[in-house]
Curated annotation (Swiss-Prot):
Keywords: Amino-acid biosynthesis, Aromatic amino acid biosynthesis, Lyase
Family, per entry: Belongs to the type-II 3-dehydroquinase family.
EC id: 4.2.1.10
Pathway entry: Metabolic intermediate biosynthesis; chorismate biosynthesis; chorismate from D-erythrose 4-phosphate and phosphoenolpyruvate: step 3/7
Name of the protein this chain belongs to: 3-dehydroquinate dehydratase
Statement: the UniProt record of this protein carries the keyword ATP-binding: no
Highest taxon of the lineage: Bacteria
PANTHER family, sorted: CATABOLIC 3-DEHYDROQUINASE
GO molecular function, one term: 3-dehydroquinate dehydratase activity
Residues at which substrate binds: 76, 82, 89, 103-104, 113
Species, as recorded: Rhodopseudomonas palustris (strain BisB18)
C-alpha cells in the first residue's frame, strides 16, 4: 500500500488563478493538486490534497495526517503562517516531517509576511517558486524519508 503525503492548503488558496495573478500566477488549486499527485506518484507516494479557509479545520487535517500515519505534510498555510501558533503547535505535536510552501516570495513582500510560525515546525521552507514549489517540496520530502523515484 502506498505511503501518503498530506498536501494542506490554507485560506484563500481556493482562489488561486483568480486572486492577484500578478503575485500568485494563473495556475488554479486544481493545477496544484494535479501537480502534487503526479509528483508524489513519481516516488511511489499518494498525495492527499485538502484545502480549508478555517484554522481549526487545518489543525484537524494535521491530526488526520497523524492518525492515518502519513509520511509527510506539505503545508501552505497562507496568511495563517504568519499568525497561527496553534498550527505550529499541531505540527510539533504530530512529529511528521513537514515542508512549508508559499507560492510567492514572502520575504519580498510586506513586512508582516516575513515571519512564519509554521516554518519553525517544518524541516524545510520554500517560497517564491510559484506552484513549482509544491513539486520541489514533495521531491525534498521524498529524499528526507528515503523514497526513491520510480522508473
Amino acid at each position: 500500500m502506498p505511503q501518503t503525503v498530506y498536501v494542506l492548503n490554507g485560506p484563500n488558496l481556493n482562489l488561486l488563478g483568480l486572486r492577484e495573478p500578478e503575485i500568485y500566477g494563473h495556475a488554479t488549486l486544481a493545477d496544484v493538486e494535479r501537480l502534487c499527485a503526479e509528483t508524489a506518484a513519481r516516488f511511489g507516494l499518494v498525495a492527499d490534497c485538502r484545502q480549508s479557509n478555517r484554522e481549526g479545520e487545518l489543525i484537524d487535517f494535521i491530526h488526520d495526517a497523524h492518525a492515518s500515519k502519513a509520511v509527510g505534510i506539505i503545508l501552505n498555510a497562507g496568511g495563517y503562517s504568519h499568525t497561527s501558533v496553534a498550527l505550529h503547535d499541531a505540527l510539533v505535536a504530530v512529529r511528521i516531517p513537514t515542508v512549508e510552501v508559499h507560492v510567492s516570495n514572502i520575504h519580498a513582500r510586506e513586512s508582516f509576511r516575513h515571519h512564519s510560525f509554521t516554518a519553525k515546525a517544518a524541516f524545510a521552507s520554500l517560497c517564491g517558486f510559484g506552484i513549482d514549489g509544491y513539486r520541489l517540496a514533495i521531491s525534498g520530502l521524498a529524499a528526507k524519508i528515503g523514497a526513491s523515484a520510480q522508473a
